[in-house]
Amino acid sequence: MMIIRELTPSDRESFFKLTKTVVYALENKDFLIPMTEEEADNTFRDNSKDVVLGAFIDDILVATLGLFHDIRDYTEVLPDNYISLKGAEIGEAMVHPDFRRNGLMNQLVESLQTYILNTPLDYLLATAHPDNISNHLIQKAGFTLLKVFERRGYTRNMYIKKLH
């Protein structure tokens, strides 16, 4: 039975275990920029504004998708008319290799979109390696390609979705 719920600080170890499994299975390791320990400390604290949803099957974390409010990494690549608006990034999209192609990411996207309806956000950002299949899911979710840029030394497509 699958359950989707928000990850808590007690899920941190499971999150990093999933990350390690996903990165190990990737043919192109550039597809995923793993969360750093510092980012995890900020995300998995009790009063964080960030939200990471997890799909659990038999109490095992098999997929994640997060909403991150700290988008300072992107301010220099955003169009000027977005700088004063409230935005967040959708990221940490991972599915365990044994559970891919089962619609888990689509279910996480739907759950996160429901959560986003209750926020004051004006836009969302999403990034993906240009060759990653996730580009199709991002576009299917209504995002528009904004530009190609470098993030932490990795080439990424940056997508944007205006909410209002």
Spans of model-derived segments:
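Conserved acetyl-CoA-binding loop-helix of GNAT-fold acetyltransferases
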Residues: 95, 101-114, 140
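Conserved hydrophobic beta-strand within the GNAT/NAT acetyltransferase core sheet
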Residues: 90, 124-128
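A short beta-loop-alpha structural element at the N-terminal edge
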Residues: 2-17
